């Protein structure tokens, strides 16, 4: 399907923009003096090993497949891919989460099986995070090794079972460093989650973990979906190995612009966390250059994934 775009002028002809290029147009268009955007889909990103992650791709670093206890899970997963198609998102880094927390051993094992199934159902579109509860120690580590190895998962997803500075989390981080994979960590700095999620991590906790493990690749989830996002951005200013996922609120303005100004565009990674149009819109609407938008939309995540060791 093509979307007509009217040009200025009473008798100007119509141009058609495909749904696929709707998102990419803002990042790949030529800028001010006609300089072409440097990244193209055919060129590998410098410093990234050969593989399926190329410059020009749009990667959603934070997506979820539907838990199979929901009767509509197949339809919901298909809708996720359809939305990505319409918005020009090439690949989605997905986890499946348990509907109740803390996750049990059987619960997160089942979720990872379903994520692997999603990768098979949508080959090349869905990339998997291995979701674990660190409290299961050896079993959690074995699960990560199994799914990053045998199933090709690209990283680890941690939720709110433990604050990230608790020692029970450290073996997970050390394994992530060994494997060279990122950890996407659920986070919020908000008073209204305290009762329901007493062990929620925030930007300060992630900054502390980053100082303890400077080799770790940490992603702070949904910077604008967890309460005081300005506080979170400032807390992570000097945590150079923490990347900020742009997903979150559908109402807060200027989160991407502030994050770019405070921590720099090289540490921002595009995410939607299921709020697809809002996730895309905040990048399109940011007061950044085409090259900077492309870094956020894909290149920064590509670089993280390219650091994999095993």
Residue ranges of predicted features:
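N-terminal export leaders
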Residues: 18-35
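N-terminal secretory signal peptides
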Residues: 1-17
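Acidic/histidine-rich helix-loop elements
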Residues: 64-75, 101-103, 193-195
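Active-site gating/metal-coordination segments in enzymes
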Residues: 90-91, 106-191
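Glycine-rich, proline-tolerant flexible connector loops at the mouths of alpha/beta enzymes
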Residues: 96-107
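Catalytic pocket-lining loop regions of alpha/beta-barrel enzymes
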Residues: 46, 151-155, 162-269
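Conserved, mostly hydrophobic/aromatic
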Residues: 62, 84, 115, 176, ...
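C-terminal segment of N-terminal export signals and the immediately downstream linker at the start
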Residues: 36-66, 70
């Amino acid at each position: 399907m093509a979307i007509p775009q009217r040009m200025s002028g009473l008798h100007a002809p119509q141009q058609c923009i495909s749904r696929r290029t709707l998102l990419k147009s803002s990042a790949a268009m030529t800028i001010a003096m006609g300089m072409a955007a440097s990244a193209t889909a055919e060129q590998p990103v410098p410093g990234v090993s050969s593989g399926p992650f190329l410059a020009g791709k749009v990667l959603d670093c934070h997506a979820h497949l539907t838990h199979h206890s929901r009767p509509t899970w197949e339809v919901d997963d298909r809708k996720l891919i359809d939305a990505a198609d319409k918005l020009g998102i090439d690949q989605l880094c997905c986890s499946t989460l348990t509907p109740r927390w803390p996750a049990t051993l059987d619960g997160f094992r089942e979720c990872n099986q379903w994520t692997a199934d999603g990768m098979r159902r949508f080959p090349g579109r869905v990339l998997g995070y291995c979701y674990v509860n660190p409290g299961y120690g050896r079993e959690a580590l074995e699960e990560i090794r199994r799914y990053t190895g045998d199933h090709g998962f690209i990283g680890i997803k941690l939720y709110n079972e433990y604050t990230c500075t608790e020692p029970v989390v450290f073996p997970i981080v050390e394994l992530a460093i060994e494997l060279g994979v990122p950890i996407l960590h659920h986070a919020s700095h908000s008073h209204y989650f305290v009762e329901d999620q007493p062990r929620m991590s925030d930007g300060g906790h992630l900054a502390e973990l980053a100082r303890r493990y400077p080799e770790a690749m940490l992603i702070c989830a949904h910077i604008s979906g967890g309460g005081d996002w300005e506080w979170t951005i400032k807390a992570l200013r000097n945590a150079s190995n923490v990347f900020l996922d742009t997903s979150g609120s559908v109402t807060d303005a200027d989160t991407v612009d502030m994050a770019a100004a405070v921590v720099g565009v090289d540490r921002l990674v595009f995410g939607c966390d299921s709020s697809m149009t809002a996730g895309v819109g905040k990048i399109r609407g940011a007061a950044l250059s085409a090259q900077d938008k492309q870094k956020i939309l894909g290149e920064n995540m590509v670089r993280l994934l390219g650091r994999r060791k095993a």
